[in-house]
Swiss-Prot record:
Gene3D superfamilies: 1.10.1740.10, NAD(P)-binding Rossmann-like Domain. One of its GO terms (biological process) is isopentenyl diphosphate biosynthetic process, methylerythritol 4-phosphate pathway involved in terpenoid biosynthetic process. 1-deoxy-D-xylulose 5-phosphate binds at residues 124, 150-151, 185, 208, 221, 226-227, 230. PANTHER family: 1-DEOXY-D-XYLULOSE 5-PHOSPHATE REDUCTOISOMERASE, 1-DEOXY-D-XYLULOSE 5-PHOSPHATE REDUCTOISOMERASE, CHLOROPLASTIC. Pathway: Isoprenoid biosynthesis; isopentenyl diphosphate biosynthesis via DXP pathway; isopentenyl diphosphate from 1-deoxy-D-xylulose 5-phosphate: step 1/6. NADPH binds at residues 10-13, 37, 123, 125, 214. HAMAP family: DXP_reductoisom. Its EC number is 1.1.1.267. Transmembrane segments: none annotated. The gene is dxr. This is 1-deoxy-D-xylulose 5-phosphate reductoisomerase. Catalyzes the NADPH-dependent rearrangement and reduction of 1-deoxy-D-xylulose-5-phosphate (DXP) to 2-C-methyl-D-erythritol 4-phosphate (MEP).
Length: 395
């Protein structure tokens, strides 16, 4: 029985993870559930899954949860960053699902890595922000990091076994790999008139044609910033160069990514667009378990199409690729600016097309400095957020 900590238990990845646990109750136990402040959702999860620990980032939410839990349930309720770092490092913890959205997920994810845990990485921002520090921590602790994002999980499945065992230090060329082909659907605005993009609403941006996701990642998909963040994540996970990484627009989301080999072969991982598949793969690797997902019906798939990304339509993707080339400081600034600009768009404060403008402004105006510690990263993250907030206020 593997005991799991689920960071971001009340989110979409958390729900999918718990669904896979339900499919395999003899093998997995939700040992600790972690959320920000969604007390109602956490209460329901506690009653259903009876974890040993329920942790709320927000202290007031933790106090409310403690009051509302049935008296007969022996669930320890906690709050605070230090307490969370201690939870993921507990000796009885076998596996940590890192699914807290955004920069907020970095400290706990890094704590799990430093504790040498098996970490299922769904928080791409951890690598986007901390890059080399994250990889060094992983290698220094012998933590096993497995990628949950459907694209990176697909790439991982298409790699030869020695490369799978060398996450963060892969020798792609030595493994006979010429390119990693990172696929993305293009989101809901792939064929929209360019002049109409400035008028798109948050609800329109969140109507992804294939995937069911949270609102922040849905907007990132609409702008293809999500693919840009995944590009940066792939650079670190697979030790890839700019020449080895390519983005391919694939509207059907059937092929989740591909690996191209020097002999002309291309290996692709395919499946229905359901996050339970990569989650189950990571939970059981190198074995396979039931995910509760219907198998792909090739007779219903129909046409598969592929396009080059249009940077006029998706300027955020270009910003991310360029930031990745510039280095860790630029990707940290970009991630922070994007979180602020997307939040502002969802709140109705700026237009959809302003997201890229705010991000570009911060990349060119925030003073970048060397990032040697997690404190350096969080300080630069704070600077970029303030710059983005000031820019949003002027739009």
């Amino acid at each position: 029985m593997q005991k799991m900590v689920i960071l971001g238990a009340t989110g979409s990845i958390g729900a999918s993870t718990l669904s896979v646990i339900e499919q395999n109750p003899e093998a997995y136990k939700a040992f600790a559930l972690v959320a920000h402040k969604s007390v109602d959702k956490m209460l329901d999860l506690c009653i259903k899954y009876n974890p040993s620990i329920a942790h709320m980032v927000d202290p007031q939410a933790a106090a409310e949860l403690q009051r509302r839990l049935p008296a007969h349930m022996a669930i320890a309720v906690s709050s605070g960053e230090d307490e969370l770092a201690a939870i993921v490092a507990l000796p009885e913890v076998d596996c940590v699902m890192a699914a807290i959205v955004g920069a907020a997920g970095l400290p706990a994810t890094l704590a799990a890595v430093k504790a040498g845990k098996r970490v299922l990485l769904a928080n791409k921002e951890s690598l986007v922000m901390s890059g080399r520090l994250f990889i060094d921590a992983m290698q220094g602790s012998n933590a096993k990091v497995l990628p949950v994002d459907s694209e990176h999980n697909a790439i991982f499945q298409c790699l030869p076994e020695p490369a799978q065992q060398a996450i963060g230090a892969c020798d792609l060329a030595g493994a006979g790999i010429s390119h990693i082909l990172l696929t993305g659907s293009g989101g809901p605005f792939l064929t929209s008139d360019l002049d109409s993009l400035s008028q798109m609403t948050p609800d329109q941006a969140c109507k992804h044609p294939n995937w069911s996701m949270g609102r922040k990642i849905s907007v990132d998909s609409a702008s293809m910033m999500n693919k840009g963040l995944e590009y940066i994540e792939a650079r670190w996970l697979f030790n890839a160069t700019k020449e080895q990484l390519k983005v391919v627009v694939h509207p059907q989301s059937v092929i989740h990514s591909m690996v191209q080999y020097k002999d002309g072969s291309v290996l692709a991982q395919m499946g229905n667009p359901d996050m339970r598949t990569p989650i189950a793969h990571c939970m059981a690797y190198p074995q396979r378990i039931s995910a509760g997902v219907e198998p792909l019906d090739f007779f219903k798939v129909g046409q598969l199409s592929f396009l080059e990304p249009d940077f006029n339509r998706f300027p955020c993707l270009k910003l991310a690729i360029d930031a990745c080339e510039q280095g860790q400081e630029a990707t940290t600034v970009l991630n922070a600016a994007n979180e602020v600009s997307v939040e502002a768009f969802l709140a109705g404060l700026i237009r959809f097309t302003d997201i890229a403008r705010v991000n570009e402004y911060c990349l060119s105006h925030v003073e970048q400095r060397s990032l040697d510690t997690i404190e350096d990263i969080l300080a630069l993250d704070g600077l970029a957020r303030r710059a983005a907030q000031e820019r949003v206020a002027k739009l």
